[in-house]
Amino acid sequence: MWIKTTDRPSLTKVVLSHIANIRMRYYFIFSTIFFIAIISGVGGIYYGTTLMGSSYGSIFASFYRYFRPSLNIISHTIQGIRSSPDRLYIDMSHLDYEKLSHQVFNAKERGFITQDEKSVEVNASIRYNVEEHNVKVRLRGSFIEHVRDDKWSFRIKVKNGSTIDGMSRFSLSSPELRNHIHEWLFQRNLMYENLINLRYKFVQVYLNGKKLGIYALEEFFDKRLIENNNMREGLILRPDDLNEEGKPFLYQASKILKDSSKQAAYNKVIDRIDEYKRMKVPASTLYDVTKSAKYFAVATLYGGQHGHLKENYACYLNPVTNLLEPIGYDSNVSRVLSRYGGMIESPNN
C-alpha cells in the first residue's frame, strides 16, 4: 500500500512567507501611527479654530495632556487613587440650586457667561474640616467651560465674618481650568520669591450630597489675602482696567469707599496712574520696580502672561511705600507656552 506524502514547502518559501508577515505587521503599525498622527493634527486644528473656549475645549486640551507618554504614569495613577484630599460639602435648598441651574442653562444657550448671570447669589452652607459655615455662592468665569456638565465654577463668600482655612472669599474651579498643578506651582514660586501669592489647594467637592470630583480652591481678593502675605491692609485694584466712571477697577469698592482715608488713598493713586500714563512721572513713582521685575520674570518663566491682561492684572497698594505691587492671579500658566514664550519647556533650559 502506497502512503501519500504531502509536499513540504521549500526553505525559500518559508523565509519569504515570514518576511511577508513581518512586512504586513510593520505596515499595519505604520498605518496605525500615521492614522493617529493625522487625526491628532486635524483635531488640533479643529480645537484651535472651533472648540477653544467652547464647553468641550478643556476636555480636548486635556486629551493631549493625559496621553503624553510618561514613565511615571502608573505610579502617579496609584498615588492619585490612594490620595485622600480634604472634603468640602456645599448644601443649598432646591430652589436656590434651580436659580443657579437657570443661569447655567441661559449661559449654555448663549455660549458664554454674562455678568448678569454671575451676579445671581444664593445662600448655602459649607461643611469643611468638621466646621459648618454660612456662605453666599454664585457662578464665576466667562467661558462656557466653567459650567460644562455638572462641574460648575463657583465664587464663595463666607458670611458673618467667618473664614474657611483663613479665607473669607475664594473660588472653586475644575483643575483643568487652572491647568492642573501648574497654577499651584506658579503660586509656590511667587511665595518663594516673597511676592504676593494666593492660597491654593485641591479639595474634593460635594454639592447637595453629589460628588463633583476634585476642585482647585483658589483664594480671592480681600484684606485676609494681604494679611496672609504679612502685609498691612491696603487697596487692591486693576490699574489698567477702567470701571464705568473711567477710574481703575477697585475690588470691594462699595465697602472700601465708605472709609474716608481709603477713598483719599484711592484718589491719589488714580492721579498718579494718570500722570504715569501721560509720561509725566517715571514708573518708579507708581510701581515697586524690584518686586514687579521679579514678578514678571517668574510669569515669563512659566508662560503666565495671561495674568497681565488688563482684566486680570491686579495690584496691591502698599500703604507703607505708597507703591503698587503685583498679585499673581489667573496666569493660565503652561497652557500656551509656545505662544507666550515661556521658558520651562524650552530646549535651551
What does each model-identified segment do?
Residues 2-3, 10-349:
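Phosphate/dinucleotide-binding and metal-coordinating scaffold of catalytic cores
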